[in-house]
Regions:
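PP2C/PPM-type serine/threonine phosphatase catalytic domain
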Residues: 1-237
């Protein structure tokens, strides 16, 4: 829902197209709940992002209990909300949110994955994790159990910030340095997304690829009542 400053990437898992069902349920449910909450304060929005992801989780999990062909389905969910001059991210799984600011490419989220846990424990390097046979094993997702707790991140937007939300179909094929180079090149969000998808496919394109790029062209100074506005071009694929 770009006109409301709401962006969601969900990457489903499960056989017989169940993953697509899970990801669609997550996107629709989260978008519905957060669009209805438009106009809430930042503090209220934090709670509503958490509630929206947990609600989507419950709906997906309940469906797995009554439809045998949907058992085991689930999805990642990475949500970006632009709220005045602030951004808010809700995150479950191994899709990622990045921020390119002043030429520096930051990964804002941390993967909920087996290999990330091994990296955190010092058993694997990030380079080893990329090619590990269990690199696609996630430890937290939406719909796998009765409840889920999302990670929440927030910060202040600046003019010329560029956000990237992406599934592991992109980040597993294209290294961060290459993604950053694409975003630093001349172009628009639409062209950057096209280049990223083309590069992932050129390298083998082993998984579904989902990417959203959001560029903050302008962040107005807060008005006396605290309201700010933004010009936010976005592209997704």
């Amino acid at each position: 829902v770009p006109d409301r400053g709401l962006f969601v990437v969900a990457d489903g898992m499960g056989g017989h197209a169940a993953g697509e069902v899970a990801s669609e349920m997550a996107v629709r449910g989260i978008a519905r709940d957060l669009t209805a909450a438009h106009g809430a304060s930042l503090d209220e929005t934090v709670g509503r992002v958490t509630a929206a992801i947990r609600s989507a989780n419950a709906a997906i999990f309940e469906r797995t209990l009554v439809e045998h062909d949907k058992r085991g389905m689930g999805t990642t969910a990475t949500v970006l909300i632009l709220h005045g001059n602030r951004y808010l991210i809700g995150h479950v799984g191994d899709s990622r949110a990045y921020l390119l600011r002043d030429g520096v490419f930051h990964q804002l989220t941390k993967d909920h994955s087996y290999v990330q846990e091994q990296v955190d424990a010092g058993y694997l390097t990030p380079e080893q994790a990329r090619t590990h046979p269990y690199s696609n094993v996630i430890t937290r997702c939406v719909g796998a159990s009765g409840d889920v707790v999302p990670d929440i991140f927030s910060g202040t937007c600046r003019a010329n910030d560029v956000f990237l939300l992406a599934s592991d179909g992109l980040t597993g094929m294209v290294e961060d340095d290459a993604l950053a180079a694409i975003l630093k090149a001349q172009g628009s969000p639409e062209k950057w997304v096209d280049r990223m998808v083309s590069e992932a496919n050129r390298r083998g394109g082993l998984d579904n690829i989902t990417a959203i790029v959001v560029r903050i062209d302008e962040v107005d100074a807060p008005t006396p009542d605290g309201v700010t506005t933004q010009d936010v071009p976005a592209s997704q694929r």
